[in-house]
Amino acid sequence: MKKVKKKKSDSRRRRNSISPQTSSDSSQQPSSETPPSCPEPASPPSKPQPCQESTTPHQVNPEPKPQQHTPQPLPPPEKPASSPFLVPMEPKPILPSRKAAVPLTYVAPRSCSCAACPGSSACWHRLGLCHSRIFDVLLPRDWSSMPGRGVPNLLTFYRKPSRKYCAPRNSRASSSRNCCCGSGGLGSCLLHG
């Protein structure tokens, strides 16, 4: 029985001697982990602070970077919306610009006397557009100033009429073009320059 007690006590001593080593190993492990992040653990007050400062900006920097990326996509859409030259290039703003142009064309028929044309329905009067404005809707206003582009044949859009019931075109446009209607049948209206 004495021998058994000694064996137990020896095993306890071994366990106690092993457990402090494991605890010392565990205490050594964090210290071994610390040097890779902080190269010199000899002066802990000064070195860990720079390491913490270096890790803190890295943690803070990723947050502002997405915030910086978020505003950057927003200004480019605002710039095309404010500049008239870039709006037609984007498909979405084209629709509002055409919608905005439609009320202008609705105002124009009042100044143009399409009522004198006997075939006013053929002059797109049903759409609320004067036949002089149809040409502007189908082609851009800068068509004549574009290099390499000739004036399209008006017979593509209108039939050749006899010239009667002429009234001056919208005051906004050049006075060289007139809104004229002929006495012919349907489709006898012509925009001539």
From Swiss-Prot:
Localization annotation: Cell projection, Cilium, Flagellum
Q: What's the protein called, per UniProt?
A: Spermatogenesis-associated protein 3
Quick one: where's region Disordered?
Answer: 1-92
- Where is the sequence biased in composition, kind Low complexity? 17-35
State where composition is biased (Pro residues).
36-48
The reply to whether Membrane figures as a keyword in the UniProt entry is no
Question: What GO cellular component term, any one, is given?
Answer: sperm flagellum
What are the leading ranks of the lineage?
Eukaryota, Metazoa, Chordata, Craniata, Vertebrata
Q: In which tissues is it expressed?
A: Strongly expressed in testis. Faintly expressed in epididymis, ovary, spleen, kidney, lung, heart, brain, epididymis, liver and skeletal muscle.
The encoding gene is Spata3
Q: Tell me the domain of life.
A: Eukaryota
Q: Where does the protein principally reside?
A: other
**Comp. bias (Basic residues):** 1-16
Keyword terms: Cell projection, Cilium, Flagellum
